[in-house]
Amino acid sequence: MCNGYDNHKIFCYQFSSVGWVKKMAYKLGWDGNKDEKGRNLLSGLKHLLTKYDDIPFKETVRQVRFWAEPDEHITQNYVFNYEYTLVFIDVREPEEIDKYKKEFNAKTILIRNPEAEAKITNESDIGVLNYEYDYVIWNDSTLDNLKKFAGTFIHEEVG
């Protein structure tokens, strides 16, 4: 949760386009390791489920709508205590990014990290740089510095 930027009350949600796929992979015996073998499993499983019926996209959209657009369910009172609700969806494939951008009228942000880019080996990550993002942020420092920058970025965009 991010809150307290000046007088704005901001609630942040983070989702992953592969979150539901990870849950299914655990049920199928995945050990949770994000080594090359594990990343390839998740990437391949997501690809198959997308090709079959766009299941990862549909499930992520359902989750986003449940939490960020509450109606009669229990989170409504809690969420309405905030002035703004920000949703971040971690997705890497350009064609998938386009679907989320269209579905939610969203802005896109690429957080680049030279170390992570050097390790790109699976199908899902290969196309991440082949997209025209609305914003590009370089993360070549510590996680704490990235969090500070993110707070400033959110303040500038919301405030």
Could you describe each region identified by the protein language model?
Residues 1-8:
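A conserved segment at the C-terminal end of the G1
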